[in-house]
Regions:
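N-terminal secretory/targeting leader peptides
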Residues: 2-11, 17, 23-127, 154-347
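A gly/proline- and charged-residue-enriched helix-loop-helix capping module
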Residues: 127-145
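Short, glycine-/small-residue-rich phosphate/pyrophosphate-handling segment
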Residues: 151
Length: 347
């Protein structure tokens, strides 16, 4: 049986790394980061396993950036929630205890509701549409820098979460009525809670690392995620009914301490951003390959892939846009994102 250590374990890991949760910036001297003759270590938190495309792309980013800077910078990637849940590590970045993290959009929308524009059903039509938008600096900079002054967080870019679907432990879901009474794990987001409610289920926010055990024990009846996470986290073992709702193209964000980004020499910062852009491309390529492999693995394991009533779910979700896009900025950003959908492949 899989279990997740209590949150205090995350703090013990932080302590063992010589980090602090207060504003001493995790021991980094911003006046000397990246100096010749020394290595500046950046700790990057990830909630995925070592087999996940995000981990692979980040490890390769680390190697390239270390080589490009002659060893002056080294990114250390900590997978599997070793440094804490996404909610915890976002606070660690904010306080300076660690330097970077990959977090979901739901975490950022809890800090600034404008992020929910990129985190709602119907925003993106495809992964290519999504990645084209994320690379559009003119469009994204006001949002991505909105937490810099208040929370010391810069959003650097994002990794696709792919297309998200429902999966359940007992019985196929074809229409919203089939989800009635079922407890479905969602991320801690008011919009995602409402999304599952509109789709017919009972939304249950829960940490990602606890989902397997919760479904195994019957605390949950299902969850929603992409095929890669569905298989790499072995959720298909306990929830073998996969309904192709395709209700959302999700996004993970790379967040970084804003003061550290500003403290980097201009050439190092440019190198880092170039290598990050390459990491986004690599991640998307890996994602597409891994999605197909995950589908084949799940199918071989006996997963029941269910075609849903797409029209019924589309109608059920229709109210969410008017409910959550409540400001001119949000509505204008949504329309700009939709207008950027050219149907072409992302770089």
């Amino acid at each position: 049986m899989r279990t997740r250590a209590p949150a205090v374990a995350s703090l013990l890991v932080i302590a063992s790394l010589g980090l602090s949760s207060c504003a001493d910036l995790g021991g980094l001297d911003l006046e000397s980061v990246g100096d010749e003759g020394k290595t500046t270590y950046i700790k990057l938190a990830l909630n995925q396993a070592e087999t996940h495309p995000s981990y692979i792309a980040l490890e390769n980013l680390s190697s390239r950036f270390e080589e490009a800077t002659d060893g002056r910078w080294k990114i250390e990637v900590f997978p599997n929630e070793q440094l804490g849940s996404q909610q915890e590590v976002l606070q660690f970045v904010k306080s300076g205890a660690i330097e970077m993290a990959i977090v979901s959009g739901t975490q950022l929308e809890n800090m600034n509701k404008d992020f929910q524009v990129l985190n709602m059903p119907t925003t993106f039509s495809s992964i290519d549409h999504q990645m084209t938008v994320i690379r559009d600096q003119d469009l994204m900079e006001p949002l991505f820098q909105s937490l810099a002054e208040s929370d010391n967080i810069s959003v650097i870019g994002g990794f696709t979460q792919g297309t998200r679907n429902l999966y359940t432990t007992d019985g196929a879901v074809v229409t919203p009525a089939d989800l009635s009474g079922k407890k479905v794990r969602v991320q801690e987001s008011a919009m995602h809670i409402r999304m599952i409610e509109l789709m017919g289920g009972s939304a249950t926010p829960l940490s990602y690392g606890e989902v397997y055990t919760a479904m195994q024990s019957g605390v949950l009846d299902g969850a929603e995620n992409n095929e890669v996470s569905y298989v790499t986290q072995n959720h298909h073992e306990v929830a073998p009914f996969h309904s192709n709702t395709e209700h959302l193209v999700g996004l993970d964000y790379m967040v970084m301490r804003h003061d550290l980004l500003e403290a980097m020499e201009a050439t190092d910062r440019e190198l880092f951003l170039e290598e990050w852009d390459a990491a986004m491309t690599e991640h998307t390529d890996l994602w597409n390959t891994e999605t197909e492999a995950a589908f084949e693995r799940a199918e071989a394991a006996g997963v029941d892939f269910v075609q849903v009533d797409e029209q019924a779910f589309a109608e059920a979700l229709a109210p969410i846009r008017d409910e959550f896009l409540t400001t001119d900025f949000q509505r204008n950003l949504f329309e700009a994102v939709r207008a950027a959908d050219t149907g072409e492949e992302a770089p």
